[in-house]
Amino acid sequence: VLNPGRTVDAIEPGFHNDPRRSLYHWYFLRKWRRSLTLKSRLFPGLIDLDAVRQHPSIRSLTEYFVPRYTEFACADDYLSGYAVTGSRLAGLKIPATIIASADDPVIPARDLGQVARPSCLCLEKHSHGGHCGFIPDFRMESWINKRLETLFQPRDKSQGGPDE
């Protein structure tokens, strides 16, 4: 996620007419509620499940939880707290790569232009890839697996790195 607030907005009902985004909203909200139900069983009294059921969206549920369970006053402060847009990555000192897709229905591609670009940051923007790992067919094979293997290979000391 580059800008969590904009990602939440991208999948919220009413912000779009893209059925893929509605599917993601349904999936994430269902998964979050299931997790909260499990936590309430493990920690009785911690979570008010009746209140959880009253929130029909990820944004409204985030707005409910943030002031109650975090040090942030509101959802927007919380969401912007872990955004990597703006100058957040300007001080990056180690090699890093962001791999993104222009057609991702969840993470707006226009947010890539809002990311600081220190010399150690590589930004790979691809035309297609969606949100699920650049899967081109029903065999579930993707070039991204090989790309990640390459990225996570140990670096040669002559290439520089944090130990220098």
Regions found by a protein language model. Give the residues of each.
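Catalytic histidine-centered segment of alpha/beta-hydrolase-like enzymes
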Residues: 129-142
